[in-house]
């Protein structure tokens, strides 16, 4: 059953209280699906009715504006088991209330600040490879996540030796998301590092903006949080700056470590990719202005509120406990008139900024 309760942030949360929570053995982020591009008429009930075809749903929510109580055009589905997400993703495309929606595995809250956490890509970077990691061993392992179309083990042109990393390309973005969510991977008994591989041109999009200015929001052009001043935490428009060195200490272009992809706020990444306009067809959207939630032109109808490049700035979505994972579900927005975020960034729309700024007036929601 769906219990629709209005909480302080104006969201309608549906939770199946009849499901035995002690039967859940996986972390919530492994069972949670982000749904973008929702029609403004879609309710918790409609969302659940569609996705329960692929498994038991323990939580469902269509995110709403805390003031207007209107849909923001996206929501979350939490299943009782991660395999149900696999089945739902195999059944794409999904159409709800006459509109094709874009489901994507939700990013864990601890990974929100990663510059490429919400990117939609089909190529996977695999680092820390050893000499015994050949193409076949890589294929044998990663083919369980999806259909592989190409494997490229990078070789030093001068010495002919392996440089310690490779790229695995799938025919879909979902296998990449699933691999990255799992985090720890062993090939031939040895741990390897996995990350989303972003094209170089993605580093250049988004323009100025930055994170400065009142309320911790964009200082330059509102709506441009990515590109040069925000996502490129390691400098430059280059994949190969900073992080762990997988290239035999060569430096320069051999660095493929933490945050080494730069990222920025643009380029088809984020939740939705491309130039999808989330919510601009809703009757209350006229004149609301920008509000980038995903980079690459993905507009989430937030009246000029910049949601920070393509980082997962919805805070990973509302959390509900299952088994030993997040048993205490905190209200995403707690407190009085200011709706100041509480509970360790539970459900915040703004990454590091603990909430989002209402059109630059320094009032926090």
UniProtKB/Swiss-Prot annotation:
Protein's UniProt keywords contain Repeat: yes
Bias (Low complexity): 1-13, 241-259, 277-286, 299-313, 354-365
Gene Ontology process terms (BP): compound eye morphogenesis; female germ-line stem cell population maintenance; negative regulation of RNA splicing; oogenesis; positive regulation of mRNA splicing, via spliceosome; positive regulation of translation; regulation of alternative mRNA splicing, via spliceosome
Main location: nucleus
Annotated keywords: Nucleus, Repeat, Ribonucleoprotein, RNA-binding
SUPFAM superfamilies: RNA-binding domain, RBD
SMART domains: RRM
Biased composition, class Gly residues, residue ranges: 205-240, 287-298, 314-324, 334-353
Span list, region Disordered: 1-24, 191-261, 276-365
InterPro entries per the UniProt record, alphabetical: Nucleotide-bd_a/b_plait_sf, RBD_domain_sf, RRM_dom
Cross-referenced Pfam families: RRM_1 (PF00076)
GO cellular component terms, A-Z: nucleus; polytene chromosome puff; ribonucleoprotein complex
Top-level taxon of origin: Eukaryota
GO MF annotation, one: sequence-specific DNA binding
Annotated RRM domain residues: 31-107, 122-199
Compartment(s): Nucleus
Function: This protein is a component of ribonucleosomes.
Protein name: Heterogeneous nuclear ribonucleoprotein A1
Gene this protein is translated from: Hrb98DE
């Amino acid at each position: 059953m769906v219990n629709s309760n209005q909480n302080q942030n104006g969201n309608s949360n549906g939770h199946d209280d009849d499901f035995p929570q002690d039967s859940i053995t996986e972390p919530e982020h492994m069972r949670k699906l982000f749904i973008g591009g929702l029609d403004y008429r879609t309710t918790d009930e409609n969302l659940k009715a569609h996705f329960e075809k692929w498994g038991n749903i323990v939580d469902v929510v269509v995110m709403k504006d805390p003031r207007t109580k209107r849909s923001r055009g996206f929501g979350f589905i939490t299943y009782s088991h991660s395999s149900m997400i696999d089945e739902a993703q195999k059944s794409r495309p999904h159409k709800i209330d006459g509109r094709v929606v874009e489901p994507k595995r939700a990013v864990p809250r601890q990974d929100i600040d990663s510059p490429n956490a919400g990117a939609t890509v089909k190529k996977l970077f695999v680092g820390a490879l050893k000499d015994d990691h050949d193409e076949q061993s890589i294929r044998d392992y990663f083919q369980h996540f999806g259909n592989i179309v190409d494997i490229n083990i990078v070789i030093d042109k001068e010495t002919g030796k392996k440089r310690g990393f490779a790229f695995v390309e799938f025919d879909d973005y979902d296998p990449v998301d699933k691999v990255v969510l799992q985090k720890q991977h062993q090939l031939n008994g040895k741990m390897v590092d996995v990350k989303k591989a972003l094209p170089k041109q993605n580093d250049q999009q988004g323009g100025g903006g930055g994170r400065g200015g009142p309320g911790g929001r964009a200082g330059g052009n509102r709506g441009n949080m990515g590109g040069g001043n925000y996502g490129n935490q390691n400098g430059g428009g280059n994949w190969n700056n900073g992080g762990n060195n997988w290239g035999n200490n060569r430096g320069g272009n051999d660095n493929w470590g933490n945050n080494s992809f730069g990222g920025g706020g643009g380029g088809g990444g984020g939740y939705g990719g491309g130039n999808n306009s989330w919510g601009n067809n809703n009757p209350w959207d006229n004149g609301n202005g920008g509000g980038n939630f995903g980079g690459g032109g993905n507009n989430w109808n937030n009246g000029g509120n910049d949601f920070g490049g393509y980082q997962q700035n919805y805070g990973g979505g509302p959390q509900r406990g299952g088994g030993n994972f997040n048993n205490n579900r905190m209200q995403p927005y707690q407190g009085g008139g200011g709706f100041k975020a509480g509970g360790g960034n539970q459900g915040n729309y703004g990454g590091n900024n603990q909430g989002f700024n209402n059109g630059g007036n320094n009032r926090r929601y």
